[in-house]
Amino acid sequence: MKAPFLVAVSLHQTNGSLTYTSALTDYRKYVMPVRPFTIALRGMYYGRFGSSAEDARLTPVFIGYPDLVRGYDYNSFDPLECGNTTDGSCPVFDRLLGSRLIVGNAELRFPPWGAFGGSSFYGPIPLEVALFADAGAAWTRQRPLRLTGVNRDLVRSVGVAARINVLGFAVA
């Protein structure tokens, strides 16, 4: 049996006081090499193009959301990380913002009760644990993507996550 996958492609045109096109490509693949372990892979690209794609009235895209690259949320930075800049910017944080982004995620998911010999697949609590690795980058036309060198834009994180399902919905 082939492993399930999902591909979403979207183009959206905005016309009015702002004119730009947004493009989204999202690819996901799920493989269960041995029950109850599942490998989940995801690659995503989003970009805004056109004359107003980087207009100051638009909120920049941000790769630090938990469903993109975990561990880089707005409150995870100390002001000391920004260094002394003359314009008040924070280069460490600014690399998470742009009009385009690319993200890759990999997870090994399993229910701990079922993985460690429990008689029931999920056990008394519908808990799922995931070991994850995330990576991503955001950029603009004025600040092109740099994947090499000292000032590269790629951010990465690894860790452990847990989810509890209630009536089929992940709640934590």
Residue ranges of model-derived segments:
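C-terminal outer-membrane beta-barrel translocator/porin domains of Gram-negative envelope proteins
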Residues: 1-135, 139-149, 153
